[in-house]
Amino acid sequence: MLSTKMTHAAGLLLLVLTAYVQADETQLVPATGKTYLETALERLHSYGEAVSGDKADGIMTEARELVEQFMEEFQAKALPEGVTTHKLAEEMAEAANAKLVPILQAAKAGIERVTAHLHESAPLIIKVRGFIESKRGVMWAYLAALAERAKKAKLDDTLKGVRDGLTALTLSSIGLMKEVKEIASAPPPAQ
């Protein structure tokens, strides 16, 4: 999940970099009434705040629309006289370094908050798993009783499907809990 969000963050970086190549810095985005750069930076700040929430999807939809709009207009413009693509790239990199580092740090802080919550939750998840495992004998005894009843009702095939499904679910849960244990045993993020 976090890797997907980081991919989205890369898309938002493109949004800001594209804003820097607008020939007319005073031109406003109709939807926001602000300049391209101001709009792009707002989207990035919002992303940093929403990195651990459902709000990210809506932000990314808006960001993609802005990127498309920026690119359409940029394609229709020529570079100013005396400006090479190399020089433009250098200017963009310098501007990005000054403007984006604080925003990236905010996004990083959001991801660290999510990781910290996972560290705090892991012991509880493992405790729940232990409880489930302690009841496994009861669970299989219940299934055995169902099997006995199913034989009388000639429902062997149906019960086999239920039992196979439960076995698959148990194996999946064990795999998930192994991942949780690894997360719990890893050092927490630096404060």
From Swiss-Prot:
Signal peptide: 1-23
Predominant localisation class: secreted
GO cellular component: high-density lipoprotein particle
Presence of the UniProt keyword Transcription in the record: no
Subcellular location: Secreted
Single Gene Ontology BP annotation: lipid transport
Expressing tissues: Plasma.
Organism domain of life: Eukaryota
Keywords from the named record: HDL, Lipid transport, Secreted, Signal, Transport
Protein name (record): Blood plasma apolipoprotein LAL2
Organism for this UniProt entry: Petromyzon marinus
